[in-house]
Amino acid sequence: MAVSLPWDAGPPLTHTLTSTVEMPLIPDQPPQFELVPTSRSRNRVRVVCLGGGTGLSMILRGVKRISNVTAVVTTTDDGGSSGRLRRDFGMPAPGDVRHCLSALAEDESLVNQLFEHRFTDGELAGHSFGNLFLAGLTDLLGSFDQAVSESARVLAVVGRVVPSTTDMVELVAEMEDGRTVRGETAIAADGSSIRTVRLDPPDPAAHPRALQAIERADLIVMGPGSLFTSTLPPLLVPGIREAVRAAKVPRIYVCNLLQQPGETEGYRASDHIGRIYEHVGDDLVDAVLVSRNRAEHGVPVPVDRGGLRRQGVRVFGARLAGEWQHDADKLGRTLVRLSRWNRDELQ
């Protein structure tokens, strides 16, 4: 299916997008991007993905072989193995970082499988080998940052995994009923509507390599994943949100396929953007990428183009849904093609 554009984009990259991305763009919205042939369209683009959880690791598998990717990862997980290691060793949560390292591993080797192996018996029950490996290296080297770098070397990682911060931070939620819930795990398990989330302490230092990657990116991707406990935490780190806001490249929010019980029940696509803006200010998202087909299970997130238009956000669509989540390969190819849109001007 040919791409429909509300302005003349020229033939070269229009052809590249044909039959892969269907874009129901808003015709009365001034263009924020222009399609222009650049030298990087023939090379591997630099993609920065922010978030955590299974959503981030899925997207990394989709882009790792067709881009130079950097994952900027949340470190607020305090449950299970990650939580125990945080408390015992005073280190940032390793779980989301471990998932990203495994997702970016060169191949699914035995070492990679070992990294994801979770013990089921004895005193190690619940721990994954990868978390213990990261904890051991952190203890040996005296640096979680160095532990991540050495783990990436062992796994022959394609791309880079960078913690959003290596400071010890806790996620805190203010619920709609007025209660305060502390800790990512407790927030996710509470089941009540979330009003806001914040970091404690509120001013952790952003990782310098995260800021550098954002500054050099050709495309910045937020989501998919749990809005309050995966997508927002990296953006709450001072310095990161400012770097994303200052970026002169497309900033894409990949909308979740499904509403998430306890976090985003009843949310439309514009509600996701609205909550991001309430937490970190507006002008942080240029476009929302949605799936034009539905997952086979779960309650889909309605795409309200009118609400997104009022927020100044464009809508891009492609057939991206698998059974439960996005098809990683389709999503990766679509995002790399969208990186060829250059922002026309800062709003």
Model-predicted regions and their roles:
Residues 2-31, 266-347:
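C-terminal functional extensions of proteins
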Residues 2-21, 74-192, 198, 336-340:
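Electropositive, gly/pro-rich neighborhoods at or near active sites that engage anionic ligands
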Residues 32-91, 95:
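Gly/lys/ser-thr-rich phosphate-binding loops in alpha/beta enzymes
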Residues 63-68, 242-248, 277-285:
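Short, conserved loop/helix-junction motifs that constitute active-site signature segments
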Residues 196-213, 236, 271:
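Active-site glycine-rich loop that binds ribose-phosphate moieties when present
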Residues 217:
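An anion/phosphate-binding loop that grips the pyrophosphate of nucleotide cofactors and donors
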Residues 227-237, 298-302:
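Glycine/threonine-rich flexible loop motifs
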Residues 234-241, 267-273:
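Charged helix-capping and loop-helix junction motifs
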